Design a protein with these regions (language model features):
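Alpha/beta-hydrolase superfamily serine-hydrolase fold, recognizing
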Residues: 2-201
Length: 201
């Protein structure tokens, strides 16, 4: 449970994720886990936190996660050149108005809106990141930024497995019990993540 905005100013969520990563790495024996086989995963804003943390760990020469798994990730506050923000502006459950509201809560008065940690899509370099699984959704206002992030990661030489689930909406991970398509998407991402975690060195 990371500190939420607006009660806590950004980048508090990133700082909390980093503290948790360091704790898990330091106490892996206590938890009975292999510290070299830990992934970072998140959906929506959790995708922002996970991808930004991977960049921080890369730059600090710390142990990288074994893999990244990002579902419909929010990876930039810059909404230019994103047709999906208009074409899916009124799509359940995430609308363009809701996105603007979230932005206003996380970045009140645009404070820290241009912070590098809020915009991994536009990082100077995306090279040197772990194998990444990305699952975007066809009916999602932030579909285009997730697709662009997958493309930039691949162009930067990273191993990327990208699925665009064309018939699904934002938050499809929550709909597995009521939608067969969402259930299949969840299974697809889970299998891909398992394969990355268990791949030979």
């Amino acid at each position: 449970d990371y500190r939420l905005c607006p009660e806590n100013a950004f980048p508090a969520p990133i700082e909390d994720a980093k503290a948790l990563w360091e704790h898990v790495q330091a106490c892996s024996d206590d938890y009975g886990i292999d510290p070299a086989r830990v992934a970072l995963a998140g959906d929506s804003a959790g995708g922002l936190i996970s991808s930004t943390l991977a960049l921080i760990l890369r730059d600090e020469s710390g142990r990288q996660p074994r893999a990244l798994c990002l579902a419909y990730p929010w990876v930039t506050t810059n909404n230019e050149n994103q047709p999906s923000l208009s074409s899916c502006a009124n799509t359940f459950p995430l609308t363009a108005d809701t996105m603007h509201f979230f932005n206003s809560q996380v970045f009140p008065n645009d404070l820290n809106k241009d912070h590098p940690w809020a915009n991994p899509l536009h990082a100077e370099s995306l090279a040197g990141l772990p194998p990444t699984i990305i699952g975007t959704a066809g009916f999602d206002p932030i579909r285009d930024q997730g697709n662009a992030f997958a493309s930039r990661l691949a162009e930067s030489g990273n191993e990327v497995t990208h699925f665009c689930f064309e018939s699904l909406t934002h938050s499809y991970l929550m709909f597995g019990r009521i939608s067969n398509e969402a259930e299949r998407a969840c299974e697809t991402l889970a299998v891909a993540l398992s394969e990355s975690l268990n791949a030979s060195d």
